[in-house]
């Protein structure tokens, strides 16, 4: 790293150590700092409120407690924590170049961002895998409730293990009287160990899961399209069921694409800096970093907006959650969307209809757990 750089050493989920963030010692005008503060404050508020509402909608309503939705809760929790504990604190550090938050929080900030990003993207991957099994291999056993909890716990444990090396080498230093939170990696020949760690982390928290999801959703899309061609037409409730599956897949594809777009420039920034360190000596680099960091962190606030726009149950949930606002008026239909449970006879008839249409090759009974047709409470809601 060039001598002109004041290193801010919080890794923001990029897999590259934070002492490569490249924030220069140049201070910004007060008006500029005020604009950036407003932008980051808006991001944090929208992300925290939106993801907290998503978690409430799912956990507070039995009809919404499904396998897929539990992964959405995991995703929302990671995004909420990322916005609350990483975006705000790292913005303060990046804009002031002084670490105000103590040694313990320095360790936490070099552990949690990679952990949260890993949890976010692998929760999306788990959703893609669940949809793949439900739609492409409907006769295969589905995740049970204990299995879902085990997958979520496994995601968090692997994420913590992946982030641990950076946390382990974190330390507090003083540079010209200013406290810094740095990652003091051990010296080796040419920094090969550090570069290898960077590449492994970027591959695991970005490129690999995106490739897996691209393949999964491509196969899902082809499968659903094949069921829509002439000769394989579904009708009535089964047509609506098929359309609901398509809409859910489109929603999750949009979530994944948004995540990929938001994080790609940030990863490229660090990759470029690894091979061309003098870019951090330019005066404009602080503004570039703050813009790329804001774009990456903004990925935490888009998912609730996407759910609200594309899923009518989440839309009803948001109306109920914000009913205290004068411009929001929830209806009885909104309450029914989240609380209504079909009668036993309705569920039996629905399962019977799915079985008939599946045997004819039209609609797969995707709401199956361990090979059995499930009730709305136990299954995966694919309705829009």
Swiss-Prot record:
Topological domains annotated Extracellular: 1-32, 91-107, 171-196, 273-290
UniProt subcellular location: Cell membrane
Covalent lipidation (S-palmitoyl cysteine), chain numbering: 324
Keywords, in A-Z order: Cell membrane, Disulfide bond, G-protein coupled receptor, Glycoprotein, Lipoprotein, Membrane, Palmitate, Receptor, Transducer, Transmembrane, Transmembrane helix
GO terms for biological process, alphabetical: positive regulation of flagellated sperm motility; regulation of uterine smooth muscle contraction
Cytoplasmic side: 57-69, 130-149, 219-251, 311-384
Main location: membrane
Residues annotated as transmembrane: 33-56, 70-90, 108-129, 150-170, 197-218, 252-272, 291-310
Disulfide feature: 106-181
Keyword rRNA-binding listed: no
Pfam family membership, one: 7tm_1
Domain of life: Eukaryota
Example GO molecular function: substance K receptor activity
Gene Ontology annotations for the cellular component aspect, listed alphabetically: plasma membrane; sperm head; sperm midpiece
Residues bearing carbohydrate: 11, 19
Keyword RNA-binding: no
Topology of the protein relative to the lipid bilayer: Multi-pass membrane protein
Function as written in the Swiss-Prot or TrEMBL entry: This is a receptor for the tachykinin neuropeptide substance K (neurokinin A). It is associated with G proteins that activate a phosphatidylinositol-calcium second messenger system. The rank order of affinity of this receptor to tachykinins is: substance K > neuromedin-K > substance P.
Entry similarity comment: Belongs to the G-protein coupled receptor 1 family.
Name recorded for this polypeptide: Substance-K receptor
Organism ancestry: Eukaryota, Metazoa, Chordata, Craniata, Vertebrata
């Amino acid at each position: 790293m060039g001598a002109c750089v004041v290193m801010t050493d919080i890794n923001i989920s990029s897999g590259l150590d934070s002492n490569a963030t490249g924030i220069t010692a140049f201070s910004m005008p007060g008006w500029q700092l005020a604009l950036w503060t407003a932008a980051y404050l808006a991001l944090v508020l929208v992300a925290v409120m939106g993801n907290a509402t998503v978690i409430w909608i799912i956990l507070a309503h039995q009809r919404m407690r499904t396998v897929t939705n539990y992964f959405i809760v995991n995703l929302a929790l990671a995004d909420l924590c990322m916005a609350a504990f990483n975006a705000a604190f790292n913005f303060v550090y990046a804009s002031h170049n002084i670490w105000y938050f103590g040694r313990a929080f320095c360790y936490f900030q070099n552990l949690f961002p990679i952990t949260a990003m890993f949890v976010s993207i692998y929760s999306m991957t788990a959703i893609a895998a669940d949809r793949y099994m439900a739609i492409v291999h409907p006769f295969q056993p589905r995740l049970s409730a204990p299995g879902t909890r085990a997958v979520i716990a496994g995601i968090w444990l692997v994420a913590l293990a992946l982030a641990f090396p950076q946390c382990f080498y974190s330390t507090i230093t003083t540079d010209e009287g200013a406290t810094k939170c740095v990652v003091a990696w051990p010296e080796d020949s040419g920094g090969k160990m550090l570069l290898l760690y960077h590449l492994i982390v970027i591959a695991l928290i970005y490129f690999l899961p995106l490739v897996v999801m691209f393949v999964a959703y491509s196969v899902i899309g082809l499968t659903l399209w094949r069921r829509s061609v002439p000769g394989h037409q579904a009708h009535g409730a089964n047509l609506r069921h098929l359309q609901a599956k398509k809409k859910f897949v489109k929603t999750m594809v949009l979530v994944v694409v948004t995540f990929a777009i938001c994080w790609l420039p940030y990863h490229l920034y660090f990759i470029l800096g690894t091979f061309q360190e003098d870019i951090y000596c330019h005066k404009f680099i602080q503004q570039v970093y703050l813009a790329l960091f804001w774009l990456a962190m903004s990925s935490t606030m888009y998912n609730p907006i996407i759910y609200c726009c594309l899923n009518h149950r989440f839309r009803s949930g948001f109306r109920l959650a914000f009913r205290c606002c004068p411009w929001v008026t929830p209806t009885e239909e909104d309450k029914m969307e989240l609380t209504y449970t079909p009668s036993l006879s309705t569920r039996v008839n629905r399962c019977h209809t799915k079985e008939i249409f599946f045997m004819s090759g039209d609609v797969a009974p995707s709401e199956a757990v361990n090979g059995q047709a499930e009730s709305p409470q136990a299954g995966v809601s694919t309705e829009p």
